From Swiss-Prot:
General remark: Major glycoprotein, comprises over 80% of the envelope proteins present in virus particle. The extent of infection into host organism is determined by HA. Influenza viruses bud from the apical surface of polarized epithelial cells (e.g. bronchial epithelial cells) into lumen of lungs and are therefore usually pneumotropic. The reason is that HA is cleaved by tryptase clara which is restricted to lungs. However, HAs of H5 and H7 pantropic avian viruses subtypes can be cleaved by furin and subtilisin-type enzymes, allowing the virus to grow in other organs than lungs.
Topological category with respect to the lipid bilayer: Single-pass type I membrane protein
Name listed for the protein in its UniProt record: Hemagglutinin
Residues bearing carbohydrate: N40, N74, N160, N179, N246, N317, N346
Family: Belongs to the influenza viruses hemagglutinin family.
GO biological-process terms attached to the record: fusion of virus membrane with host endosome membrane; fusion of virus membrane with host plasma membrane; symbiont entry into host cell; virion attachment to host cell
Post-translational modification as stated in the protein's UniProt record: In natural infection, inactive HA is matured into HA1 and HA2 outside the cell by one or more trypsin-like, arginine-specific endoprotease secreted by the bronchial epithelial cells. One identified protease that may be involved in this process is secreted in lungs by club cells. Palmitoylated.
InterPro entries associated with the record: Capsid_hemagglutn, Hemagglutn_HA1_a/b_dom_sf, Hemagglutn_influenz_A/B
Alphabetically ordered keywords of this record: Disulfide bond, Fusion of virus membrane with host endosomal membrane, Fusion of virus membrane with host membrane, Glycoprotein, Hemagglutinin, Host cell membrane, Host membrane, Host-virus interaction, Lipoprotein, Membrane, Palmitate, Signal, Transmembrane, Viral attachment to host cell, Viral envelope protein, Viral penetration into host cytoplasm, Virion, Virus entry into host cell
One Pfam short name: Hemagglutinin
Length: 360
């Protein structure tokens, strides 16, 4: 910043009197003011920055969650959310979470009709909680549920640590043992088993196949009806019979059937209900979740730390109070988006050098 020179010269004589006023060097700084429009000033401080794209980072001063289960190798977040065998582990607590799976999220183990329900939203629902844990006990006794006794079905595409066959830990595939006959709708109550103050996320579903397989497994080859109800939300489904091409998941045997998977959220102390016919996937282990975690769309890995996480620019450190560029969701200690750059005038209004005035 160039110095402002104030010079006042008064010369008194019988001759002419010459006066000069405030002068300064030429100023390149122009600011827009509310009352005078564009004004030249002697100095400014920039208040805005235009970020460049960078990698995402851990948010300073808080825990940031990338994958739901960092130690569950070769598992999608949906695998973890459904508790697929070999994809069960600890989900770290976090105040901020990264939505990092940009393509349609799928799960292995058994062919799922993902588009029939909101099941792809389950990982995002879990990300929105600070603390998430899978219950150690099953919410109901599936083998003795109404319409049973049942044996619990497994799949060769779901190997667990002790067997070549397994299934999702959140659900039990209820196959009638001896009473393979059609049934009227049956009702099972789903109790609340989480700790006080936790939301309970209960996963359930149903299996359907071609007519021959439905008759063999359940004794009924007709479409089956299913309903879930919890927290004032009721959902109805009717199973599709046949019409599925064979599909193989993760090197297992080709499957002619499909499963439809959904979930319901039970608030503290509230009981849920499931009304079902043949082919039901009864709930088993449930998610218990509490607190809130801010979620932002991003990418992995998380490298270093940043003041702010921005959906378009990644990790940002706050060097200025405002920023220009793309406006998008951001979390943390973030600059404020403005349309045009802002400057703080820290000098005075520029005045051109005063002209010499001659008085007689």
């Amino acid at each position: 910043m160039k110095a402002i020179i104030v010079l006042l010269m008064v010369v008194t004589s019988n001759a002419d009197r010459i006066c000069t006023g405030i002068t300064s060097s030429n100023s390149p700084h122009v600011v827009k003011t509310a009352t005078q429009g564009e004004v030249n000033v002697t100095g400014v401080i920039p208040l805005t920055t235009t970020p460049t794209k960078s990698h995402f980072a851990n948010l300073k001063g808080t825990k940031t969650r990338g994958k739901l289960c960092p130690n569950c190798l070769n598992c999608t977040d949906l695998d973890v959310a459904l508790a697929r065998p070999m994809c069960v582990g600890t989900i770290p607590s976090a105040k901020a979470s990264i939505l990092h799976e940009v393509r349609p999220v799928t799960s292995g183990c058994f062919p799922i009709m993902h588009d029939r329900t909101k099941i792809r939203q389950l990982p995002n629902l879990l990300r929105g909680y600070e603390n998430i844990r899978l219950s150690t006990h099953n919410v109901i006794n599936a083998e003795g549920a109404p319409g049973g006794p049942y044996r619990l079905g497994t799949s060769g595409s779901c190997p667990n640590v002790t067997s070549r066959n397994g299934f999702f830990a959140t659900m039990a595939w209820a196959v009638p043992r001896d009473n393979k006959t059609a049934t009227n709708p049956l009702t099972v109550e789903v109790p609340y088993i989480c700790a006080k103050g936790e939301d309970q996320i209960t996963v359930w579903g149903f299996h359907s196949d071609n007519k021959a397989q439905m008759k063999n497994l359940y004794g009924d080859s007709n479409p089956q009806k299913f309903t879930s109800s919890a927290n004032g939300v009721t959902t109805h489904y009717v199973s599709q019979i046949g019409g599925f091409p064979n599909q193989t998941e993760d090197g297992g045997l080709p499957q002619s059937g499909r499963i439809v998977v959904d979930y319901m959220v039970q608030k503290p102390g509230k009981t849920g209900t499931i009304v079902y016919q043949r082919g039901v996937l009864l709930p088993q282990k449930v998610w218990c979740a509490s607190g809130r975690s801010k979620v932002i769309k991003g990418s992995l890995p998380l490298i270093g730390e940043a003041d702010c996480l921005h959906a378009k620019y990644g990790g940002l450190n706050k060097s200025k109070p405002y920023y220009t560029g793309e406006h998008a969701k951001a979390i943390g200690n973030c600059p404020i988006w403005v349309k045009t750059p802002l400057k703080l005038a820290n000098g005075t209004k520029y005045r051109p050098p005063a002209k010499l005035l001659k008085e007689r």
